[in-house]
UniProtKB/Swiss-Prot annotation:
Domain of life of the source: Eukaryota
Cross-referenced InterPro entries: DEP_dom, Dishevelled_C-dom, Dishevelled_fam, Dishevelled_protein_dom, DIX, DIX_dom_sf, Dsh/Dvl-rel, DVL3
Organism: Mus musculus (Mouse)
Modified-residue entries (Phosphothreonine), positions: T346
Subcellular location per the Swiss-Prot or TrEMBL entry: Cytoplasm
Record carries keyword Phosphoprotein: yes
Dimethylated arginine: residues bearing it: R698
Recorded name of the encoding gene: Dvl3
Protein name (record): Segment polarity protein dishevelled homolog DVL-3
Length: 716
């Protein structure tokens, strides 16, 4: 007994199905096929041979008709019929030889796009109707005018408007173009009398057309219950962006760049491939330099090759071939402004004009528009920056940056000061290099980009790179391991020469808080990483003294006192604070022989400070600076203690003529305010105002920073 294989394609699904009938091929009828499938609501088309046209798809509706056989098997296509709807089918009425298109590829990328993608969307010919799936909704809307019913049972409201209201214009004439624009440009809605799985695209075309192919969209989505919401939202986003006709063409000059710099994402579903999208954009590539193409955009055409009816694999292959050829590349993309993109794209972000992705905005759109978000803020504020401040603060930040009016003729220090300011847009943050944390570092390529876009006078990026190299040679920026050649791939920190200037812009920050927004001198560790111990742990104030031995010295902040405090830590750890001899303390007060009584008081608090501050951070950079720096540190601390005692004799909380660093409310606390801040807190004034007696503290800092690589290992 013979056996017949029947291969059938169901709707637009790309993979065919196979059934076997225990009958010889010449005896198989449509009734036998239907008995196996049990799908009464489908129309059956079979591959057959026509004398005039050759191989065609022939519809067979007679159950007793023999099925055409090729090479011992039957090839069939099943298309959803309109069995659940009262309207008769509009197809195959005029010319039975004109058949629907092959479902092998029409269920692919074309189905996921609205009619605005297709050049024949406005045509009304019979050829367009039968051969183009997307055209069907427009043309059949005009052919079905006599059969439309506007009764109450069909007037379900969509977004406050009944179907009947949408179907006709005041003059009584149908306008399918008005219908499409009014429904597809609204936000997502669902037809209340249809299945919940019907998306916006299918519901709008459903009522504008009674055609068989558009009902196929609806039935297809009913089968995809699991991923229905995700897919319909994706389709509606494509519909929105393309109905606004925001399609741009970008020509990229590949001579200046080594690579295109995009990753692409292919969208596929049961109906086939759904298009090629921009997944991410890499810095340094041609696309990132242009700035107009963004993640989530749909790639429609490359050079003269259209991706519309091409599978994802073919599109990727063509794109690779084009990239390897010399010459410019022209990309045509559809901008996708979906506020909630699919998971394969980057996270949703925002921009002042329209919703896009803020990380992409920072990397390339900011370079084109000139709006920069704030960086280098404390962790508690960084979350605000990533969401709302891109809208609220970008304009003021830009205005503040524009106040500098920087050019290549400006003072180099002024340019570095603007670059170091928090609102400059330069990404300064802690970075990891060989498992070493580099605090407040930035990439060389970011410096070049910042100079090129914010300093006037550069004709090309190469000149901006030369300027960055000069900044390195002049000491305004420093390599983390003291390399003198500039590279865009290396991490850099601000040098000693610009450390002061960076802090001048931070004078409004309160240095007495437990964590500071910016480091005083790079490369100090970020103070917010761990709490710092109090410099004065005792619960009683230092004993008052009738006079201030140093009335002219300003108060000491820890911007330059941090090094000396660290020296005290290490000194105390070596001599184990509690067993310190009196001779050590006499060394400290010998240079000041005139104040023997105050020397004893200072030594006592000095001894207490050294004993209490030994901990995990004892080893500081100044420990390597040698005995000389430690000796200077004693004198620095002596002045610090004397200055602290002056708080109890002067109600103004500071020396005469010098405004206090911190407000009186902070000084009411038991520990002296100058000792409250961590070693990384910003200073109150420039290092140049430090008295000559304390210049050794500044030298100990610079000696410690002479070998930053060891310093970073020490901090970890």
């Amino acid at each position: 007994m013979g056996e017949t294989k029947i291969i059938y394609h169901l709707d637009g699904q790309e993979t065919p199905y196979l059934v076997k009938l225990p009958l010889p091929a010449e005896r198989v009828t449509l009734a036998d096929f239907k008995g196996v499938l049990q799908r009464p609501s489908y129309k059956f088309f079979f591959k057959s041979m026509d004398d005039d046209f050759g191989v065609v798809k022939e519809e067979i509706s007679d159950d007793n008709a023999k099925l055409p056989c090729f090479n011992g098997r039957v090839v069939s296509w099943l298309v959803s019929a309109e069995g659940s709807h009262p309207e008769p089918a509009p197809f195959c009425a005029d010319n039975p030889s004109e058949l629907p298109p092959s479902m092998e590829r029409t269920g692919g990328i074309g189905d996921s796009r609205p009619p605005s993608f297709h050049p024949h969307a406005s045509g009304g010919s019979q050829e367009n109707l039968d051969n183009d799936t997307e055209t069907d909704s427009l043309v059949s809307a005009q052919r079905e005018r006599p059969r439309r019913r506007d009764g109450p049972e069909h007037a379900a409201r969509l977004n406050g408007t009944t179907k009947g209201e949408r179907r006709r214009e005041p003059g009584g004439y149908d306008s399918s173009s008005t219908l499409m624009s009014s429904e597809l440009e609204t936000t997502s809605f669902f037809d209340s009398d249809e299945d919940d799985s019907t998306s916006r695209f299918s519901s709008s075309t459903e009522q504008s057309s009674a055609s068989r192919l558009m009902r196929r969209h609806k039935r297809r989505r009913r089968k995809q219950k699991v991923s229905r919401i995700e897919r319909s939202s994706s389709f509606s986003s494509i519909t929105d962006s393309t109905m606004s006709l925001n399609i741009i063409t970008v020509t990229l000059n590949m001579e200046k760049y080594n690579f295109l710099g995009i990753s692409i994402v292919g969208q596929s579903n049961e109906r086939g491939d759904g298009g090629i999208y921009i997944g991410s954009i890499m810095k340094g590539g041609a696309v990132a330099a242009d700035g107009r193409i963004e993640p989530g955009d749909m790639l429609l055409q490359v050079n003269e090759i259209n991706f519309e009816n091409m599978s994802n694999d073919d599109a990727v292959r063509v794109l690779r071939e084009i990239v390897h050829k010399p010459g410019p590349i022209t990309l045509t993309v559809a901008k996708c402004w979906d506020p909630s993109p699919r998971g394969c794209f980057t996270l949703p972000r925002s921009e002042p004009i329209r919703p896009i992705d803020p990380a992409a905005w920072v990397s390339h759109t900011a370079a084109m528009t000139g709006t920069f978000p704030a960086y280098g803020m404390s962790p508690s504020l960084s979350t605000i920056t990533s969401t709302s401040s891109s809208i609220t603060s970008s304009i003021p930040d830009t205005e503040r940056l524009d106040d500098f009016h920087l050019s290549i003729h400006s003072d180099m220090a002024a340019i570095v000061k603007a670059m170091a300011s928090p609102e400059s847009g330069l990404e300064v943050r802690d970075r990891m290099w060989l498992k070493i944390t580099i605090p407040n570092a930035f990439i060389g390529s970011d410096v070049v980009d910042w100079l090129y876009h914010n300093v006037e006078g550069f004709t090309d990026r190469r000149e901006a790179r030369k300027y960055a190299s000069n900044l390195l040679k002049a000491g305004f920026i420093r390599h983390t391991v003291n390399k003198i050649t500039f590279s865009e791939q290396c991490y850099y920190i601000f040098g000693d020469l610009c450390g002061n200037m960076a802090n001048l812009s931070l004078h409004d920050h309160d240095g007495s808080s437990g964590a500071s927004d910016q480091d005083t001198l790079a490369p100090l560790p970020h103070p917010g990483a761990a709490p710092w111990p109090m410099a004065f742990p005792y619960q009683y104030p230092p004993p008052p003294h009738p006079y201030n031995p140093h009335p002219g010295f300003p108060e000491l902040g820890y911007s330059y006192g941090g090094g000396s405090a660290s020296s005290q830590h290490s000194e105390g750890s070596r001599s184990s604070g509690s067993n310190r001899s009196g001779s050590d303390r006499r060394k400290e007060k010998d240079p000041k022989a005139g104040d023997s009584k105050s020397g004893g008081s200072g030594s006592e608090s000095d001894h207490t400070t050294r004993s209490s501050l030994r901990g995990p951070r004892e080893r500081a950079p100044s420990e390597r600076s040698g005995p000389a720096a430690s000796e200077h540190s004693h004198r620095s601390h002596h002045s610090l203690t004397s200055s602290l005692r002056s708080h109890h004799t002067h109600p103004s909380y500071g020396p005469p003529g010098v405004p206090p660093l911190y407000g009186p409310p902070m000084l009411m606390m038991t520990p002296p305010p100058a000792a409250m801040g961590p070693p990384g807190a910003p200073p109150g004034r420039d290092l140049a105002s430090v008295p000559p007696e304390l210049t050794a503290s500044r030298q100990s800092f610079r000696m410690a920073m002479g070998n930053p690589s060891e310093f970073f290992v020490d901090v970890m």
